[in-house]
Amino acid sequence: LRQVQAMSATTSAAEPLLRVLRTACRLPLLAWHLLVHLPVTLLLIAIDTVGGKRVGHLAIRWWARGLLWVFGMRVRRIGTPLPGGTMFVANHLGWIDIVALHSQHMMGLIAKAEIRGWPLIGWLAKAGESIFLQRGNAHSLADVMAEMSQRLRAGHAVGVFPEAGTRDGRELGPFHARIFTAAVEADAPVQ
């Protein structure tokens, strides 16, 4: 028992130092990822298609996977994303959800309109084919629904967070069921 307590005390005393060391290692990796990999990704997004392949989509997936790696995160995927016009549904705990989803499959996510004006993040959201929604505006919602249906019919994936906001992960919030109408109208699968 004393040995276990001593190990526990040593581990907890070493934890702040380990955290500092992890951060010291990750900061240069993050800087490299933002200063080198991001411009390469943006260039590939601008090129978009090479030989019929969507290199922009591949670049976004590559960049998202790299960012997760820099932060020491791993995604455990169960199953395979359906190809083509599929509506992907996920809980929304924070910004990392977007990166995790894009690391697995390219999709245009529904985002609040304010994000469009954010420095760098807004541009990345546009490059990631986000569909912007002005919250509380019925006309904007109708436009978003029409855009989602059109993209799904055209064979492009769309991602939604039906709780329409972030949660702490302990409980589900109410779903905005109307968002699923786009998949029904487009006769698209939901995953």
Q: Can you name each region flagged by the protein language model?
A:
Residues 1-6:
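Short, Lys/Arg-enriched N-terminal segments with co-localized hydrophobic residues
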Residues 69-191:
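Soluble catalytic domains of membrane acyltransferases
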